[in-house]
Amino acid sequence: MRYITAGESHGPQLTAIIEGLPAGLEISPEMLDLQLARRQQGYGRGDRMKIERDRADILSGVRWGKTLGSPVTLVVKNRDWENWLEKMSPLAEHEGQAEAVTRPRPGHADLCGAMKYGHRDVRNILERSSARETAVRVAVGAVARGLLHALDIRIGGVVVEVGGVAAKPSAEPYPQQWAQAAASEMFCCDPAAELDMKRLIDHTKSIGDTLGGVVEVQVLGLPPGLGSHVQWDRKLDARLAMALMSIQAIKGVEIGLGFEAARRPGSKVHDEITWNPARLQQGELTPYQRPSNHAGGLEGGMTNGEPLVVRAAMKPIPTLYTPLQSVDIATHEPYEASVERSDTCAVPAALVVAEAVVAIELAQALLEKFGGDSLDEIRRNRDNYLAGLRDF
C-alpha cells in the first residue's frame, strides 16, 4: 500500500490517492469524518478551526461501502477557499493580485524552501508546507485504522506533556486511557495535569507565544513478525520513526523507553522472556510473554507481540503573534516575521495525526506480511500464520 497527497493550505481542496488496498474493506465517510473532527479538537487551537468543518469525500475505489481493490481517492475541501480565489488562483491572469510574502518565519520551511525552488514569494512555499496538509493524511489514516480494526488490532493514544507540564504515567489499561483522553480537551488522562496545561496555554496565548509537547501512540493486538531485520529500510521502528518525523513540527521520536534506555544498565532495559501456554486460552496470540515492555513492542526492527508504544515530541508552532526577527528577502532589511493565522498549542491535534501515520505504517506492514487481493484472503493468511505461532 502506498499513498500520495496534494493540495495547498488555502487552495480548493486536499487530495489523497491510496493504492494497494485489498478489496472488501469497509469504508464510510462517517469513519473518516470522525478522525477529521478529532483533529480539529483540543484546547489552544486557532480561529481556522471555527472556519473549517472538515469532511472527507470518497471519489473512487469504493462501491456500496467497500473497497474494490482499485485506487481510492479522498478529498477534503478547504471551506475558506472562497476568500482566496484570486490569491491562490492557478490561472496566470490573476498573477500579481496578491501582495508577495517576503518575510520568512523562523522555524518554518519559508526561507530554505524559497531558496531551493527560486521563489521570491514565500507563499509558494508556506501553502504546501503548512500542517493543513495533515487533514488529508488523517483521512488516509482513518482508512488504515479500518484495516487494523478488521484484523483485530486497536490503536489509540494520549497527550503526555505540554510545555513542560507532564501527565503522571497511568497504570490503567490502554483502552481505559483512551476513553479518559476522549473526554479531555487536552486528550490527556491526568485531570490535574490537564488543568495545568490549560492554564499554561492561556498564559502563553496572552503573551503571543506558542507551546509544544509530547504525544504517545499505543497499539494492541499486533502479531509478532511485522517488519524485518534483514535490511535497514524494512525495520519497522525505522519506518515508524520516519512517518512520525514527517509530521510538521515533530522533532523527536521514542519507542518504548526511548532515550531513557541510554541512562540505564542493560539489566534494567531488556525485557525478559517467559513461556505460558495458558495465554492461548486467554485469547493471546502466542504463549510467549514479557513481564515488562521497555522495548515498546519492537525488537530487531520487528513487532514482538507486546503492545506498540511510541512517542513523538512536537516543537512549539513557529508562527508567533509576537513575531521573531527575520529579514525581508526583497530588501534584505531586518523586519519582524510575517504572521499567519495559527494555534497557540496544537499538541492534541498532533496526537490524532500521529495515530494516523502509525496506522498507515502498520497497515503497510500487515499487507506486506499477509498480502492478498481481498480482505478475506488476508485474514486467511494471517490465521494460518498465527496457527503456526501457537505451536512455536
UniProtKB/Swiss-Prot annotation:
Coiled-coil regions listed: none
Keywords: Amino-acid biosynthesis, Aromatic amino acid biosynthesis, FAD, Flavoprotein, FMN, Lyase, NADP
Disulfide bridge partners, by residue number: none
Top EC class, one word: lyase
PANTHER family hit by this protein: CHORISMATE SYNTHASE
Function per UniProt: This reaction introduces a second double bond into the aromatic ring system.
The protein's name in its UniProt record: Chorismate synthase
Natural source organism: Trichlorobacter lovleyi (strain ATCC BAA-1151 / DSM 17278 / SZ) (Geobacter lovleyi)
Gene: aroC
